[in-house]
C-alpha cells in the first residue's frame, strides 16, 4: 500500500531523501507506461517518473504538467485527485512486491529549467533568462514559440529607479539555447506553484 502525497513544487526530491538510491531506469520506464494512460485521461502530460530507494522505503515520484498549448499551472485539487487514482493503479500492480512505498505527485514549479521546446511553450508570456550558446545571455519576455525557436522581447537595463526598456523582438533558434529559467514576477504569484521558487502548496492524500 502507499502513502500518497500531492504537491505542486519544483523540488523534485519532495521528501528530502537526498541520499535515496534511484531505481534502475527500466523500472521507472515500466511504471511510466503503467501510469501514463491515466494521466492522459486527465488531459495532462506525464513529465517524469522516478523511483528512489532508501533502505526498506521506496518513493515513486510522478511529475505531471498541462499540455504545452496551455498556460498557467495544474491545480492542487487536480493533483490530489490524480494522486489517489495513480496510487490505486500501483496498489493493483502485480509486478510490485509487498514493500510499502510513498507516492508523490507534483507539478513543475517556477524554478524548473527550460530545457525542452514544450517547456518554452508552457512559459509563453513570461519573463525569462536565456542561457545562449556562443552568445550573450538574454533576459526578456517570451512573445511566441514555434518549431524552430523562441521569439523574445528583450529587456534593456535602464538607469536606477527607471523601468527597463523593451527592445525589438528577437528570434533565438533552439540550437542556440542551452537552457532558460522563468523570472519570478509579483504579478504572477497567484498562479499555482509560484508561491515559492522551490516549494508550492502541498496536500497529503
Curated annotation (Swiss-Prot):
CDD domains: YlxS_C
One cellular-component annotation, GO: cytosol
Gene3D superfamilies: RimP-like superfamily, N-terminal (3.30.300.70)
Positions with biased composition (Basic and acidic residues): 18-27
Entry keyword set: Cytoplasm, Ribosome biogenesis
Subcellular location: Cytoplasm
Polar residues bias spans: 1-13
GO biological process assignments: ribosomal small subunit assembly; translation
SUPFAM superfamilies recorded: YhbC-like, C-terminal domain, YhbC-like, N-terminal domain
Pfam families: DUF150_C, RimP_N
Region of interest called Disordered, as start-end residue ranges on this chain: 1-27
Main location, first listed in the record: cytoplasm
Entry-linked NCBIfam families: PRK00092.2-2 (NF000930)
Chain's role: Required for maturation of 30S ribosomal subunits.
Family under the similarity heading: Belongs to the RimP family.
The name this protein goes by in its record: Ribosome maturation factor RimP
Organism of derivation: Arthrobacter sp. (strain FB24)
Gene (UniProt): rimP
Amino acid at each position: 500500500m502507499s502513502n500518497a502525497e500531492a504537491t505542486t513544487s519544483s523540488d523534485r526530491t519532495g521528501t528530502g531523501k537526498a541520499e535515496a538510491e534511484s531505481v534502475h531506469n527500466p523500472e521507472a520506464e515500466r511504471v511510466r507506461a503503467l501510469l501514463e494512460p491515466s494521466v492522459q485521461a486527465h488531459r495532462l502530460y506525464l513529465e517524469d517518473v522516478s523511483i528512489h530507494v532508501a533502505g526498506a522505503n521506496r518513493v515513486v515520484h510522478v511529475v505531471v504538467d498541462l499540455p504545452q498549448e496551455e498556460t498557467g499551472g495544474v491545480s492542487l485539487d487536480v493533483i490530489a485527485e490524480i494522486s489517489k487514482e495513480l496510487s490505486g493503479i500501483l496498489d493493483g500492480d502485480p509486478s510490485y512486491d509487498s514493500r510499502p512505498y510513498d507516492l508523490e505527485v507534483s507539478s513543475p514549479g517556477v524554478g524548473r529549467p527550460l530545457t525542452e521546446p514544450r517547456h518554452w511553450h508552457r512559459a509563453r508570456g513570461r519573463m525569462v533568462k536565456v542561457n545562449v550558446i556562443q552568445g550573450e545571455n538574454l533576459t526578456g519576455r517570451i512573445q511566441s514559440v514555434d518549431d524552430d525557436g523562441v521569439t523574445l522581447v528583450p529587456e534593456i537595463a535602464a538607469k536606477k529607479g527607471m523601468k527597463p526598456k523593451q527592445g525589438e523582438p528577437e528570434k533565438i533558434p533552439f540550437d542556440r539555447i542551452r537552457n532558460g529559467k522563468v523570472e519570478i514576477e509579483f504579478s504572477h504569484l497567484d498562479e499555482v506553484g509560484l508561491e515559492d521558487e522551490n516549494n508550492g502548496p502541498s496536500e497529503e492524500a
